[in-house]
A protein has these predicted regions:
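Short basic alpha-helical hairpin corresponding to helix-turn-helix/winged-helix-like nucleic-acid-binding
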Residues: 8-11, 21-26, 30-35
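Acidic, metal-coordinating catalytic segment for phosphate/diphosphate chemistry
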Residues: 1-12, 16-17
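Conserved hydrophobic "DFG−1" position in protein kinase catalytic cores
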Residues: 14, 22, 89-90, 107
């Protein structure tokens, strides 16, 4: 039986003025622009929370003024990978810089995100699962 030991991930679902911040960037493995939430690898000496703050700032140019709220942690593909993804949510944001080169930020409502998913432009299954969990289970969005 084969499986890969892979890094864990953090993801942030940020919301400002009743819109979710979504980033788009070219993803080499699929050779397409993909829409997704800010996310990244949790480095060896980081917690998932530290990684989430870093990814939010690097990918969007926004900083959360309050502690990020944890959504849930789950395995991304337990039959093949050891990767866990931990999601966080915030709606208390302040703009501090520009996003990283090659990343565009967008403000979408919930309906817009569902349309992107249906058009297969929002293609990361763990991001979709985290978003669905958030809107179904978290109060006061």
């Amino acid at each position: 039986y084969h499986y890969l030991k892979t890094s864990n991930l953090s993801l942030v679902i940020p919301k400002i003025k009743n819109k979710y911040i979504v980033v788009s960037q070219k993803r080499v493995p699929i050779n397409k622009i993909n829409y997704e939430f800010p996310s990244g690898i949790v480095e060896k000496k980081e917690t998932t929370l530290q990684s989430a703050y870093k990814e939010l700032s690097e990918e969007t140019g926004y900083k959360s003024r309050s502690k990020l709220s944890k959504i849930i942690t789950f395995y991304t593909e337990p039959g093949r990978l050891t990767t866990k993804i931990t999601g966080y949510y915030t709606k208390d944001l302040i703009k501090i810089s520009k996003p990283e080169k090659g990343i565009k930020i967008h403000l979408f409502n919930q309906s817009d995100i569902f349309k992107l998913i249906l058009k297969q432009k929002f293609n990361n299954s763990s991001h979709i699962a985290m978003f669905l969990y958030l809107i179904k289970n978290i109060k006061n969005l």
